[in-house]
């Protein structure tokens, strides 16, 4: 179930990256996503955009970016057009195999980074889209654990025993 959607169409030029970054920032502000998770999302979506520009920027005038909010997380999609099958094939290789290579191409580096930072990477073959899913439910769990740790440390300094 999609809760919220956004669409952004930008020229297939690297100089349009600021519009992509603005979309990510707007979404992350709306969902109170900050720090490293914001960085993961921004870097992944930016890499996917730059990857799409590098792979098909000369052939297409525009690249479409989509955002969806789903119960399990935030989804960003980037159109890949004619090069969809080539790009999907790059994502089939194991990350370890790509990292072990002596030399890694710019495209392979982008693929590795996106796969490492996104929680899920999928492809929509009908619409020729690269889909990156970022789970946001675990953010609250991480925050809760961090708060518990900080409170425990605080009470440890006060020498107050914790009642369980």
Regions found by a protein language model. Give the residues of each.
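Conserved short strand/loop->alpha-helix "switch" segment adjacent to the catalytic nucleotide/phosphoryl-transfer site
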Residues: 22-49, 99, 103-104
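A generic structural micro-environment signature
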Residues: 16, 39, 127-129
